[in-house]
């Protein structure tokens, strides 16, 4: 079976969309789907769908019936969420955005386990966020040395993200989910960064509404 590392970034970016749609099919009691039907929903071609599935594992459709929805979901869940191994995750920044993101992490079955939250504001220290007590950022080194988190969620301004990301890499962080309103990059090829810009889709919506024929 091919591993996720062998899939290109564009393929990886499409996997969550496949997953969401297949979940809706399963909820509706649909057991199989053709590459052509999937392509229509994904806005791509049947050939591209087949190429994507060749990248992620032993995914084979049947003549006349297509792909098994259950089998596709099982493969995608293993790739996207792991096989029960939820990644230990810490949150940096416990303002309104941090609180909202923490609720998503702790309530959605997404392969991550929030184990700590940090903030620079002494007024936030000791409060709870999604059932976790907020720590001061000065405790970062000692906590990471003991608990070995793998992922950091950044809900801080740009200057804060730039300052803390280097510290976090030195402490063993392997992945960043970055909400700091700019594209974070780290000079380490083995560290994965996902930059999230919540306003991008809103700007796209505005453009499309204002520029319709």
Task: Give the location of each predicted region.
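Hydrophobic, well-ordered beta-alpha structural blocks that scaffold small-molecule cofactor pockets
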Residues: 3-12, 16-171, 179-181, 188-213
